[in-house]
Amino acid sequence: MTQDDKKTPGQFSRRRFIAGSAVLGGSMMMPGFMNSVWAAGTDAPEKKEIRVGFIPLTDCSSVVMAAVKKFDEKYGIKIIPSKESSWASVRDKLVSGELDAAHVLYGLVYGLQLGVSGPQHDMAMLMSLNNNGQAITLSNQLKQAGVTDAASLKKMVDASAKGTYTFAQTFPTGTHAMWLYYWLANAGIHPFNDVRNVVVPPPQMVVNMKIGNMSGYCVGEPWNQRAIQDDIGFTAATSQEIWPDHPEKILGTTSAWVAANPNAARALTAAVLDASRWIDTSDANRTETAQVVAARAYINTPVATIQGRMLGDYENGLGKKWKDAHSMRFFNDGAVNYPYLSDGMWFLTQHKRWGLLDKDPDYLAVAKKINRIDVYKQAATAVGGINLPSGDMRSSTLMDGKVWDGSNPAEYANSFAMKR
């Protein structure tokens, strides 16, 4: 947990975990016994084979490793990872039922719930997959012109005609769009009025920058490190600089799928949660994970492109190297994975800020509908030894000093000087 989170209502408590272990299932069961009941008894998963979509990004790792390391078998299921080409493809296949669940952008699921990022569908968020590990890359052409950070970019944008520079993100309601907009706005650059912004699928970012289609982009790893290795760009900011330990990808599905497959949803969540804990247990496990997901079937990039930042070893392409205290995390003693209502609500505040929503929704009601805390708690009990927080909100301080704790989302959404 970050320093900001340590004294919040969402603080993790081992005592709370013990008291809350018998969630929504009657009496407490030992993890091994619970798993055998799920696999063979009345709580057996309704589906044995579960197709889970993913985009080639480092943060798909827990889904992939749940299958590769056979955590899925412990819970009576078989996860079939399905590599997808874009977030739009993930969206379409989720709502059509071609995918059972997916490694997906937090904001994509919330956008679907409100009919913003496609036709309205009731959605479900089963768990958070990771914190941190995204970045904003700027082109070497900008570097050669003297741009090395947000302040120097602001000067160049101000000196040019509006729309001269193009920036890419990965989906209109997604996390990368929100990090990019927040970073630009914090520098005084309006993401819609001062520059152009376009949607590009994550694996296509590097090649599009190489041929000059954009001046910058926001995406997940390894595509920021890849730009440095290919000598076409540099890291201007990491997403954890914008919001330390921010929410990012989630395990998402439709509400209808959970209703039809409650035991399978629980088993899937448990398997991915178990894999998340395994990844974060040691640098050796993280290294093994990098070696697995680098393969052609998954991310299809050199291991070195993934491994460094996965271990917290950063370079920015401008000569600076550092050990990042908030590098990508998959578990962090369970703090990563809990479906905090405030995390989902934050994305809605940014959708409102940037005109994707024309009025304030019932922020809390939407989050309670999507974030399936009940399923997560059941899965956490089955896995065993997973700390649960004492509340469903957490407090964080973002790069501009604003504190977000979910307490007054409408006021927060309308408090920004720069908006659309």
Regions found by a protein language model. Give the residues of each.
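Short gly/pro-enriched beta-turn/loop segments at secondary-structure junctions
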Residues: 245-246, 288
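Short, glycine-/small- and polar/acidic-enriched structural segments
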Residues: 40-199, 208-227, 232-245, 397-411
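N-terminal secretory signal peptides
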Residues: 1-12, 31, 38
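Short glycine- and hydrophobic/aromatic-rich loop-to-beta-strand nucleating segment
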Residues: 136-137, 250-253, 257-258
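Secondary-structure end/capping motifs
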Residues: 260-372
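Conserved C-terminal helix/tail region of periplasmic/extracytoplasmic solute-binding proteins
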Residues: 345-420
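N-terminal export leaders
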Residues: 13-30
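Extracytoplasmic/secreted proteins, especially bacterial periplasmic and envelope-associated proteins
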Residues: 67, 89, 93, 175-179, ...
